Amino acid sequence: MHPPAPDAPILFFDSGLGGLSVLGPTRALLPTAPIVYAADYAGLPYGRKSNEELAARVPALLGRLVERYQPRLAVIACNTASTIALGHVRAALDLPIVGTVPAIKPAAEMTKSGVIGVLGTEATVRQPYVDDLSARFAGGKTVLRHGSPGLVTGAEARLRGETVDPEVIARAVAGLRDQPRGDAIDVVVLACTHFPLLKDELQAGFGRGVALIDGAEGIARRIAHLTDGQAWPAIAVPGIAVFTRSDERPPPPLAVLAPYGIGSIETV
């Protein structure tokens, strides 16, 4: 396989804007990397879709995007899509694919109380994959889960400069705290890439004694490792954001995306 051209982009894919929480740390490690950020607004929210629907939708859409933008690597910057469709995507596409998995392993290493919370979408927290991660890396620990669709909507609103409903945060916190042993949680895994965008609000809700962790920096390091030795442009060029068309959800203003190095918006 020939090495990629310097202008071959990294493709980030999410249901919405949550993947920006992964793009940020990646930009820090690879500041001149060309970026295509794709958000499936026509399919948002993924957390309420069936496994079968996502297993068909995500590989098909990524296939179109790969054909159009010819990336050197694709990042599924979405826990729900990764836990359900990562294997299907890897089988369908002939390029490196980086997925997003709940950070249960580092949470298990960090907890002192032995009680870990996992906050994700409804689809992510019901996956057997999360059972497997818990069994492999958190044996002997209590792993409590809660699916919070409201946080996805809240994160999208937050990025647009809108106020986040405090009740959304309170319900997410209570969803873990009100379970048996929930009061002993000292580490919460943010198992949706949207949720770190609300880290300040969630930290206030859980209290300073609870550590909030996510996998974004680990994913960025993985991307840097997989592209080590490849050529990049000498200077950064503005990235492209691509949104699937949605009548009820127009793309955000470019000003929302500009801090992440995005310079233009397209729809497909």
From Swiss-Prot:
PROSITE patterns: ASP_GLU_RACEMASE_1, ASP_GLU_RACEMASE_2. The active site is at residues 78, 192. Its EC number is 5.1.1.3. InterPro entries: Asp/Glu/hydantoin_racemase, Asp/Glu_race, Asp/Glu_racemase_AS_1, Asp/Glu_racemase_AS_2, Glu_race. It catalyses: L-glutamate = D-glutamate. GO terms for biological process: cell wall organization; peptidoglycan biosynthetic process; regulation of cell shape. Pfam families: Asp_Glu_race (PF01177). GO terms for molecular function: glutamate racemase activity. Keywords: Cell shape, Cell wall biogenesis/degradation, Isomerase, Peptidoglycan synthesis. This is Glutamate racemase. It comes from Sphingopyxis alaskensis (strain DSM 13593 / LMG 18877 / RB2256). The gene is murI.
